[in-house]
Amino acid sequence: MLNEFINFETISRSDWQRFYQEDQVSLTPEELESIRSLNDKIDVQEVRDIYLPLINLIRIYHRAAEDLTFSKGIFLQKAQANRPFIIGISGSVAVGKSTTSRLLQLLLQRTFPKAKVDMVTTDGFLFPNQVLIDKGILNRKGFPESYDMPLLLNFLDTVKNGGDVNIPVYSHEIYDIVPGLTQKISQPNFLIVEGINVFQNPINQRLYMSDYFDFSIYIDADVKNIKTWYLERFQTLLELARKDENNYYHRFTKLTKEEALSLAQKTWKEINLVNLENYIEPTRNRAELILHKGDSHKIDLIHLKK
């Protein structure tokens, strides 16, 4: 069997952290806490060792993209419009995609003070629950067929070509698209697109979301760790929903601790694990960079495409 990482440069954490530059911006513990997702663990040292070198790498790709746009303009003998630098971030549920995305957004804003840095999640392109019910696929929520891929691809195409667009907003508290609420994306310099499906496209195999990406990241971890983090997150969500009857997870607070754990394990085994093994993990080698997390959520290995 061909080694999946044959086209990647594998870099240890100790080697990677040497790419940090002393004059780079950093963050305070309070700022990190404000962007941290449930049960995710990140500290200032992780930012310095992993994410500041990553910002250096993104700067290289960004500069190369600008140079290519300029050179194309000379070749075509016409001015080329500025296009947003789009970063795709993928990985399993509970692996820390959202924290990584918000962290990169903050660091990019510090690194490029005059730039507009927006972030979207592909959750907003899930079909509303009623549509999933009508299609008979509510139990497949999060799988490729549960996303409005034409809408998602049209969004990327519009933004890449300088247009403004309003997109749906998803709420984990109500477990559905929020009726009447949209997020406006208007000519950002950087756009971070985060979701489990950013390297997939089940509708039109001739066009992938990744065709619009200038840089892409896959957050990786051993399955046993992802399962543990998922179960921990589920318990945290229940605690947060205990006094909020409008929260989707409130209904599960009526269960005993053992019943709730059993439900979470069943959901992991029948939905999230299947989705990871069949649809998410097989796309990771489409990423430009793979960040592997160890037991303690720390990045311990980096794979960079050659």
UniProtKB/Swiss-Prot annotation:
Keyword Flavoprotein: no
GO molecular function: ATP binding; pantothenate kinase activity
Protein name (Swiss-Prot/TrEMBL): Pantothenate kinase
GO biological process terms, semicolon-separated: coenzyme A biosynthetic process
Coarse class of the protein's main subcellular location: cytoplasm
Family: Belongs to the prokaryotic pantothenate kinase family.
PANTHER family: URIDINE KINASE
EC number: 2.7.1.33
Catalyzed chemical reaction(s): (R)-pantothenate + ATP = (R)-4'-phosphopantothenate + ADP + H(+)
CC per GO annotation: cytoplasm
Pfam families: PRK
Subcellular location: Cytoplasm
Lineage: superkingdom: Bacteria
Keywords: ATP-binding, Coenzyme A biosynthesis, Cytoplasm, Kinase, Nucleotide-binding, Transferase
Organism of this sequence: Streptococcus thermophilus (strain ATCC BAA-491 / LMD-9)
